[in-house]
Design a protein with these regions (language model features):
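N-terminal low-structure segments adjacent to metalloprotease catalytic domains
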Residues: 1-128, 132-133, 276-291
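Metalloprotease/metallohydrolase-associated module, dominated by Zn2+-dependent proteases
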Residues: 2-4, 120-131, 152, 158-161, ...
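A generic secondary-structure signal for well-formed alpha-helical elements
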Residues: 97-100, 201-205
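Auxiliary, metal-adjacent structural segments of Zn-dependent hydrolase domains
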Residues: 100-173, 182-183
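Short, polar/charged, Gly/Pro-enriched helix-capping and turn/loop motifs at alpha-helix termini
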Residues: 103, 207-208
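An acidic- and aromatic-residue-enriched active-site/binding cleft used to recognize and process polar
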Residues: 150, 177-179, 206
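Short pre-active-site segment immediately N-terminal to the catalytic Zn-binding motif
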Residues: 175-194
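Active-site His/Glu-centered metal-binding helix of metallohydrolases
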Residues: 193-202
Length: 291
């Protein structure tokens, strides 16, 4: 039950109670006592997202069991964590779900339907992985996530593609099939959520001294780290010239051994940026942080 519900239920009870007293006693002055409770209910209804966020951020709860099971089934990084860090991971994912907007495109016939929980979870899991070692629980300038039923065109990129980042509006767009494929087929598949949120991280959260200086000459090394060539990644995204920091983020979490072997300096910078060393599978956090 959401925290705001604990306020509205008693208020509704007392409002109904006073209306009932007024009705059965034929004395409608009693109905006036219901007015404050109705006003409180209306205020809580309008402010419920903010109330729920404030309460749960101070007392974070882990994901519901069915979502945690889905996470444990598919997320390799999560499976290897210590029990304490699994709990932290779960809480960060839950807070990310609560603190961001997930919606369908206006052109979708099912626009009014809610985005399925598993699709939202895939994005939240990528965010929790990236932010596990940091105090942040979301990306301040990016709080809108659009899930399209298939590949999509946009005014910026008219061809069909699977993911895109709109920095100006703080929106990240994904196609649902590619999002699910990347999550359920890891590490063989390229995970779009990790890629795009890695881009978000380095454009909003990371300090400049922790951002590696990658250039296109290092594509061959990135390919050797993952066995994913540039063409494969481009076909997954649906756009040419993938962002190198997004690709590096993906490979850092999925192929840490080869990453450290082939690009040790970049690996260390990423460890500093994320405050994580994925080579230490059970406890990758370098310096402990408060949630």
């Amino acid at each position: 039950m959401k925290p705001s519900t604990y306020i509205t239920v008693p208020c509704i009870f007392f409002a109904v109670l006073f209306f009932a007293i007024a009705f059965f006693n034929d004395n409608y002055a009693w109905a006036l006592y219901a007015v404050p409770f109705i006003i409180i209910c209306a205020g809580v209804f309008v402010m419920s997202p903010q109330i729920d966020w404030w309460v749960l951020k101070k007392n974070p709860q882990p994901l519901p069991t069915h979502l945690e099971n889905y996470l444990a089934q598919h997320q390799t990084y999560y499976k290897k964590l210590s029990p304490e860090l699994k709990t932290l991971y779960s809480k960060k994912a839950a807070l990310f779900l609560l603190g961001n907007n997930f919606f369908r495109p206006a052109s979708d016939e099912n626009e009014r339907a809610k985005v399925p929980e598993d699709l939202k979870l895939i994005i939240a899991v990528a965010a929790a992985q990236i932010l596990l070692g940091r105090e942040e629980v979301y990306f301040a300038k990016f709080d809108n996530y659009m899930i399209c039923p298939n590949t999509f065109p946009t005014p910026v990129y008219p061809s069909q593609h699977n993911s895109e980042l709109f920095a100006l509006d703080g929106v990240v767009i994904f196609s649902a099939p590619a999002l699910v494929h990347g999550f359920t087929q890891q590490p063989r598949a390229f995970q779009l959520a990790t890629y795009e949120l890695g881009r978000v991280f380095f454009s909003t959260v990371a300090s400049t001294e922790t951002i590696p200086n990658l250039d296109i000459s290092q594509w061959n090394v990135l390919e050797n780290i993952s066995s994913m060539n540039k063409n494969f990644i481009e076909s997954t995204i649906g756009l040419a010239n993938p962002d190198l920091m997004g690709v590096a983020t993906h490979h850092f979490f999925n192929f840490p051994q080869k990453f450290n072997q082939l690009l040790p300096d970049v690996f260390q910078l990423l460890c500093n940026a994320f405050n994580q060393n994925p080579l230490k599978e059970m406890n990758p956090i370098i310096a402990s942080q408060k949630l």
